[in-house]
């Protein structure tokens, strides 16, 4: 597994698809290291990656401790309220804010303002977590009461399908909703970012203006 080579190939694809979508800025690549060892995560760091994503408490703590201090740590998975206190002040971004109970606990435990993505279930699948697209505005309005939460953007996970036009339509819907929220000029919810696209569909997300793509197996492989 050559992480440097993988990153170069991913960046080439991102550049190609950003040009195709008339997007001037390439998305940040988050190395999703939940299935790999600390050594492999270090390979990603040495290849130039600075954004790392974990979705399990144990893995997050191990990687956070082992990697250099200049990394940007993203917690990208669903977070149980009882585990908020162990995570929230150790991360730079939280990608899965999807319920008020969680927002309340984050606000209570946070020692500073936390950069959060509201997770949106754009596809409407029962198996997917997230706020329904039609409920995003109302959900974000209710977050105004929580002084330690800053809604920096929206996040979604597309379904596993070969139908690229369908996936693109979902990413377009998220982008449109982001633009709608951004236009409201809310101090607590600037909503300038988009977290979307994984190993199978990051190229489509790039075309639609993703700010962050979350790439695991295609970048660092899978060891566990």
What are these regions (language model features)?
Residues 210-224:
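Gly/Pro- and small hydrophobic-enriched strand-loop and loop-to-helix capping segments
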Residues 1-200, 206-208:
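Conserved alpha/beta-domain cores
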